[in-house]
Curated annotation (Swiss-Prot):
Source organism (scientific name): Alkalilimnicola ehrlichii (strain ATCC BAA-1101 / DSM 17681 / MLHE-1)
HAMAP family in the record: Adenylosucc_synth (MF_00011)
Listed Gene3D superfamilies: Adenylosuccinate Synthetase, subunit A, domain 1, Adenylosuccinate Synthetase, subunit A, domain 2, Adenylosuccinate Synthetase, subunit A, domain 3
Subunit structure: Homodimer.
PANTHER family associated with the record: ADENYLOSUCCINATE SYNTHETASE (PTHR11846:SF0)
Subcellular location: Cytoplasm
MF annotations from Gene Ontology: adenylosuccinate synthase activity; GTP binding; magnesium ion binding
Name of the protein in its database record: Adenylosuccinate synthetase
Catalytic activity: IMP + L-aspartate + GTP = N(6)-(1,2-dicarboxyethyl)-AMP + GDP + phosphate + 2 H(+)
A GO CC term attached to the entry: cytoplasm
Cofactor(s) needed: Mg(2+)
Amino acid sequence: MAKNVVVVGSQWGDEGKGKVVDLLTEHTGAVVRFQGGHNAGHTLVIDGEQTILHLIPSGVLREGVQCLIGNGVVLAPDALLEEVQELEGKGVPARERLRISPACPLILPCHVALDKAREAARGQARIGTTGRGIGPAYEDKVSRRGIRVADLFHRERLAAKLGELLDYHNFVLQHYFHEQPIDFQDVLERCLTYADELRPMVADIGQLLQEHMDAGRDLLFEGAQGTLLDIDHGTYPFVTSSNTVAGAAATGTGIGPRDLHYVLGITKAYTTRVGSGPFPTELEDEIGDLLGERGREFGATTGRKRRCGWFDAVALRRAAQINSLSGLCITKLDVLDELETLRICIGYQCGDQLWESLPPGAELLADCEPQYIDLPGWQSSTLGVQQWDDLPENARAYLRKLEELIGVPVAIVSTGPDRKETIVLQNPFESA
């Protein structure tokens, strides 16, 4: 019987999902992206060679693994084809391994222009988007005026839908934001070029997943961003435009929820956030700087510096609840190696009230003071450790405390960026 695992970020994204997905795809017939777009940045390091992926699933470097992009993903054709060409330049047959849902909404130049214009207009109140058109593309999907991959292969239908779409968005660009309009003919010609390139890679993703399961092959569902950026459950409005939680693996691919057997939450040993929004455990001192330097906390997609802070067990408990987490993968443990004392947030003091669960709304969270417990650090190297018993005693105690506070077992520990720098305590595919 096929066993299917969902991998999600359990914080504000950037938890190290790409490495873990690459590691686990050794056991799978296919890996599938189910939400987000090329605002994701998944970094893989294999035998010292780094590969950064934005749209293509992180299993693409594994021979014999099919990589699927589900209907929940918003697709920027230019970004996808650029990524394909980069992989082919490294000898990876990306076109052979990749299949794309015809129902994927397209990100077009008008979406990028709108995204950037809106963010600029917000000034100091900006959300911190990547400016890649993700939000406007999802808006068009929900409003039922979006253009999908399937539309590329019907010129007259494409031209009619594109004309209507640009009439709408150009009005806003010109008369509200005072920006230049997007040229219809230029976008149409680009889309027709994309059609020729994409056609061989388009397939019914739900049917492919069913065929893999019927053949007894395991599946891996790769989430992007993180739980606390979910459009419904995150720190709204400082969130992304898609559902980033495990439930989206079903709606974003066409698989039934009963076929999702194990949910692995990827979790840094500390906390980071990029862009705007509340961050109770943020450290704006030398420890925060140390975490950023040792963790190389710069976005793989935007290059922006990430904000760093202590581990937040309150937020993680909510992520565990929303996702029904089966296990945790703790990443970047080695970043904490030099610290004498480690702090874990176990509650928020908001005025006279102590919250031990995540308060509703970003506004309330911004006014909370974190309540901590302190644990001794280990001040010795964990970099590259591959066996649990080889970790320092205090490192093991720290991980066990996280298990206790969150109520979810630690299944995997990452001790470095390379695929092999990993401790596997519980293989999700053997536990599913």
